[in-house]
Design a protein with these regions (language model features):
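Glycine/serine-rich phosphate-binding loop and adjoining beta1-alpha1 elements at the start
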Residues: 2, 8, 77-169
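An N-terminal-biased, well-structured beta-alpha scaffold segment characteristic
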Residues: 2-110
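Generic structural signal for well-ordered, non-membrane alpha-helical segments
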Residues: 15, 19, 43, 97-100, ...
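Short gly/ser/thr-rich secondary-structure transition/capping motifs
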Residues: 52-58, 73-75, 151-157, 215-221
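Single conserved hydrophobic/aromatic residue that forms the stacking wall/gate
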Residues: 237-246
Length: 246
């Protein structure tokens, strides 16, 4: 198969669809990989790192789309890419169709075959390609929350982890899935007083055994949340579909 990796053009997206190590595995299995010039540079992978493992470099996005049977990206295509996608071409990336009607209709119209990372599901209903993004999202949420507690950002001037003689911030995390548990781990590591709430008791038991001792668990009943929310300095909402056991 001919696989193409274009450079991401979505605003502030610096990742790349395939790393050199991934390309090496694909080439070893007999496939051909084309990388757009500087596609990996913002992730720390120069063109030379790709050519060293057997990839070929093409100068433009248009050339990559034209030659590839499958396009591997990180984020969904945006408007300038729509016209480059042809009928039957495979696209492997995060799509999140539910939040983007224009994208959904464009992919239907061009007849491409869209494989959305976020919907790849294992037999146990876990989503292996969504988990890494969720881990990043949870940790970044805590980091951003801590920033917005600062006075220059409009916050109350509270340091998440406190200092000797001053209590740490109280953090309430709603949802104990991958995003929530990573947010809790990050907040706990920064020294906050953390509570993570969920309606899945089995999940809460697991979290109480695996998260640091400054993380408490709470069954997320309406009454308990009404009592808890007014007392916290930072609340992070990471609630996913209740049918997902992850």
């Amino acid at each position: 198969m001919i696989i193409g990796v274009p450079k991401e053009i979505k605003n502030n997206e610096n990742r790349v669809g395939m790393t050199p190590s991934g390309v090496a595995e694909i080439v070893k299995r007999g496939h051909t990989v084309y990388i757009q010039h500087t596609a990996g540079i913002n992730s720390g992978f120069p063109d030379a790192a790709y050519t060293a493992v057997g990839a070929q470099i093409l100068p433009t996005m248009e050339e990559v789309y034209a030659i590839a049977e499958m396009i591997v990206k990180v984020k969904e295509p945006i408007a300038p890419e729509y016209k480059l996608i042809r009928k039957g071409q495979l696209l492997f990336t995060y799509f999140h169709f539910a939040s983007d009607k224009e994208l959904t209709l464009a992919m239907i119209e061009n007849g491409s075959v869209c494989l959305a990372y976020e919907t790849v599901e294992k037999a146990d209903h876990s989503l292996p390609l969504l988990i890494p993004m969720s881990e990043v999202a949870g940790r970044m949420a805590t980091q951003e929350g801590a920033r917005f507690l600062e006075r220059p950002q409009g916050g109350k001037g509270i340091l998440l982890g406190g200092v000797p003689g001053v209590k740490p911030a109280k953090v309430l995390i709603l949802g104990g899935g991958i995003v929530g548990s990573n947010a809790a781990q990050m907040a706990a590591g920064m020294g906050a007083d953390v509570t993570i709430a969920d309606i899945n008791l089995a999940r809460l038991r697991y979290l109480s055994e695996t998260l640091p001792p400054n993380v408490k668990t709470l069954y997320a009943s309406e009454l308990r949340l009404k009592m808890e929310l007014p007392t916290v300095d930072l609340s992070l909402i990471h609630i996913s579909e209740p049918t997902r056991p992850y």
